[in-house]
């Protein structure tokens, strides 16, 4: 994949394909390419849900950590593309190699990027911290999976399903619990209900 990023894809799907990568950007190009390949195989591309995460934590690349604004923009773009634990780990290694030990805000940025990716895969449209609670809103509601999650002993008595016009889960945070860690736990446990 890195070779493709460096050298370019060339004429992958036909004579008119060459040269379009530069006009749409590499990331969008890969997405369009993946959709075209799925279409050629007769598969229906799964619509991607982009999860919004609003947690009350500081998550950024401080200017005193990455001084060059252009490098920061590039890193923000690349961090937003994190989809797996391995990609998060690789990005953390790169930050350490290039800029030294990252501050807590940079670690939080990596964690949020991975959380958003995992939540998006599960159809979670939004994760929000509000009034001592975590609220999870879903693009599609699977009541069997949500009921299974609500029955988890770790959340007993504090995870509620609001089945209104826009169903959502509400988890009351206990004193001392970190919203980020609990959001990760909720998303991981919700993913496990699909298996």
Language model segments and positions:
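Accessory helical-bundle/CTD segments and flexible terminal tails appended to RecA-like ATPase motors
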Residues: 1-195
């Amino acid at each position: 994949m890195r070779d493709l990023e460096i050298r370019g894809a060339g004429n992958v799907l036909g004579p008119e394909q060459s040269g379009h990568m530069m006009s749409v950007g590499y990331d969008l190009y890969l997405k369009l390419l993946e959709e075209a390949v799925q279409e050629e195989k007769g598969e229906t591309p799964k619509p991607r849900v982009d999860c919004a995460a609003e947690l009350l934590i500081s998550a950024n690349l401080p200017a005193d950590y990455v001084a060059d604004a252009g490098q920061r923009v590039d890193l923000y773009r690349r961090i937003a593309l994190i989809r797996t634990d391995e990609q998060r780990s690789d990005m953390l290694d790169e930050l350490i190699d290039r800029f030294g030990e990252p501050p807590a805000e940079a670690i939080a940025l990596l964690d949020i990027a991975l959380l958003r990716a995992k939540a998006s895969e599960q159809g979670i449209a939004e994760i929000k911290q509000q009034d001592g609670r975590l609220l999870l809103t879903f693009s599609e509601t699977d009541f069997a999976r949500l009921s299974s999650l609500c029955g988890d002993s770790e959340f007993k008595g504090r995870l509620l399903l609001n089945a209104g016009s826009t169903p959502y889960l509400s988890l009351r945070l206990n004193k001392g619990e970190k919203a980020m860690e609990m959001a990760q736990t909720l998303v991981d446990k919700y993913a496990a209900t699909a298996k």
